Amino acid sequence: MADNDGAVSNGIIVEQTSNKGPLNAVKKPPSKDRHSKVDGRGRRIRMPIICAARVFQLTRELGHKSDGQTIEWLLRQAEPSIIAATGTGTTPASFSTASLSTSSPFTLGKRVVRAEEGESGGGGGGGLTVGHTMGTSLMGGGGSGGFWAVPARPDFGQVWSFATGAPPEMVFAQQQQPATLFVRHQQQQQASAAAAAAMGEASAARVGNYLPGHHLNLLASLSGGANGSGRREDDHEPR
């Protein structure tokens, strides 16, 4: 005694319901956040279309896996200029990235001090460290003025700024100039003395060649004339 809508049992109507509704969707557990917690996460950066196209092109040319890796590479390349302009890096300390294949003396947010720079700049204070070649050529002259340098960029080149005072190269030139003039003066004096000695020897040779012959000819003529006059007197004397 039952129908599709319900059944009667001991005077009690029991309703039968069918579970034909849609199955409840299984919710996935929240995935673990694998990104670093940084300020501004979730924000979108707007850039000109030319810049975006250039980023995409660099991603293909450099063989990066994502555009974010290319932007990170660009930040690494521009980090020296960023440090020179702001004094510190622009990336938070909590930012962690995978190391790239490109070697660079700078890392995001921090500057790597090389061994050569650490040795040469150990007692120089907190200024910018210069390499051995440039440091010795500039510091060896004893110039009184200090200087600072901005790291080089391909589009701007190296920028140097010297404080008041002549550069050491000019000091070297001024110190070497009197010595050079003295050496040249000595050489000129030696050359003039040698020329005067040569002229004296030549004139003495000329005098020795001409004067003795002239005197000999004169003596010969006089002696010849005296002998002739004596013979003539002998001829006129009667015998």
Curated annotation (Swiss-Prot):
Q: Where in the cell is it found?
A: Nucleus
Tissue specificity of this protein? Expressed in leaves, roots, and stems.
Q: Name one GO molecular function term.
A: DNA binding
InterPro entries, alphabetically? Answer: TF_TCP_subgr, Transcription_factor_TCP
Task: Name the segments for region: Disordered.
Answer: 1-39
Query: Cystine bridges: which residues?
Result: none
Recorded phenotype for the gene knockout or disruption: No effect on the period length or phase of the circadian clock.
Q: Its Gene Ontology biological processes?
A: negative regulation of DNA-binding transcription factor activity; positive regulation of circadian rhythm; regulation of circadian rhythm; regulation of DNA-templated transcription; rhythmic process
Q: What protein does this entry describe? A: Transcription factor TCP21
**Species:** Arabidopsis thaliana
Output the lineage of the source organism. Eukaryota, Viridiplantae, Streptophyta, Embryophyta, Tracheophyta
